[in-house]
Regions:
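Conserved beta-strand/loop elements of the cytosolic catalytic core of P-type E1-E2 ATPases, chiefly
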Residues: 6, 74, 181-185
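Asp-based, Mg2+/Mn2+-dependent phosphohydrolase catalytic module
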Residues: 201, 224-238
Length: 238
């Protein structure tokens, strides 16, 4: 959605909203965002069908303003605490937060949290005792890391990949974002589910995107459409 459907204010423009609503085509939003961050666009576009959040960790529908999960793939709970502790120790300046189905959590307000708030207009839930909070049964779908230093981001990504944790996948989503989801949470898996559910043929489908986390999705559709703002390696697949 960011860098693709949404404008610089994080909104669907009136022109695009009207064109999409009047197209008569079924539209699914496929995003790294949480459902709460997708809600405004879904309502603006009048979408009623399946939507995909958290890079494929959640397939859902909006029903009467509520999220109705269809397929969920949260992170392994004990690994969430392990990752949070490790990242805080090794990369204390990186902005870190995480999501369950309906909430965005953090333990401090920093530049990354303020940036995300301005982009999505969401308010984080502040956690003062994280160990106790995570002792309860809770489905965490995504850990989000933000750094505006490219060198720090590259070091963070390479370090996390070197941990060789088989249950997670690590993806860049924009220049400043690194996101951790379950290994089975991929946009392409969400697309496959919708293909089967709606009995779609590949030649009937197109996808728009601009990031590395869109590449698996592009491989599933007949018409991958890459935005002008994408990097050259992403444009190469179009």
């Amino acid at each position: 959605m960011d860098g693709t459907l949404l404008n610089s204010q994080g909104e669907v423009s009136l022109t695009n909203a009207e064109l999409i609503r009047n197209s008569g085509l079924p539209v699914t939003l496929v995003s790294a965002r949480a459902p709460m961050e997708m809600r405004e666009a879904i309502e603006t576009l009048g979408l009623k069908g399946l939507q995909i959040g958290f890079n494929g960790a959640l397939i859902y529908q909006m029903r009467d303003g509520n999220v109705k999960p269809i397929r969920v793939q949260p992170l392994v709970q004990n690994e969430v605490q392990e990752l949070l502790t490790y990242i805080r120790k090794q990369f204390p300046t990186v902005s870190m937060s995480y999501y369950d189905l309906n909430n965005w959590y953090c333990d401090r307000i920093d530049e990354g949290i303020r940036y995300e708030h301005n982009l999505t207009h969401q308010q984080p839930t502040f956690i003062t005792d994280e160990d106790k909070f995570l002792e309860a049964t809770i489905n965490i779908f995504k850990i989000m890391l933000i750094s505006f230093s490219e060198s720090e981001m590259q070091k963070l990504e390479s370090t996390l990949r070197s941990l060789d944790m088989n249950n997670i996948t690590i993806q860049r989503s924009g220049k400043a974002y690194l996101e951790i989801t379950h290994v089975n949470a991929k946009k392409s898996i969400g697309i496959d589910y919708i293909f089967e559910k709606e009995k779609l043929k590949k030649e009937e489908t197109a996808a728009f995107g601009d990031g590395h986390n869109d590449l698996p999705m592009f491989g599933r559709v007949a018409y991958p459409i890459v935005m002008e703002n994408a990097s050259d390696d992403i444009k190469a697949v179009a």
